[in-house]
Amino acid sequence: MKFFVYNPLLKTASLNIKVKAAAKSNDIKEFIIINDVLHLKLSIKAHAQQGKANEEIINFLAKEWQLLRSNLEITKGHTNSLKTILIKNIDEEYLNLILKPYIK
C-alpha cells in the first residue's frame, strides 16, 4: 500500500490523515487503514470549531516536519475528521524520511 501519492514533476505529495480534535496533546500516531486507504492518525489539542483544528494541524505538522506553513494545505475534509493534505516543494526522499517513524 502507498502511504502517499507523490508527483515528481510538481514536487508535491498528497497524504490522508485521520484527526482527533480536542485531544490532550498534539501528537502524530501511526498509519491506520480506513476503507482500504492508509491514513496518518493525528491528535490535535484544538477544538474542531471555526477552523481552529485545521489551523493547528498545519502549524503542528509544519513544526514537526520542519516545513513552511505555506507548503501545507488541507485540500479535502475541511469539516471532517478524514482529511487530505497537500505537501508542496518536497523531495520524495525527505517525505519518506519524515514518515518512516509512523510506519509500523
Curated annotation (Swiss-Prot):
Annotated Pfam families: DUF167
Source superkingdom: Bacteria
Span of the signal peptide: none
HAMAP family the UniProt entry points to: UPF0235
Family from the record: Belongs to the UPF0235 family.
NCBIfam families assigned to the protein according to its UniProt record, in alphabetical order: DUF167 family protein (TIGR00251), PRK01530.1 (NF002419)
Protein name (database record): UPF0235 protein A1I_04385
Source organism per UniProt: Rickettsia bellii (strain OSU 85-389)
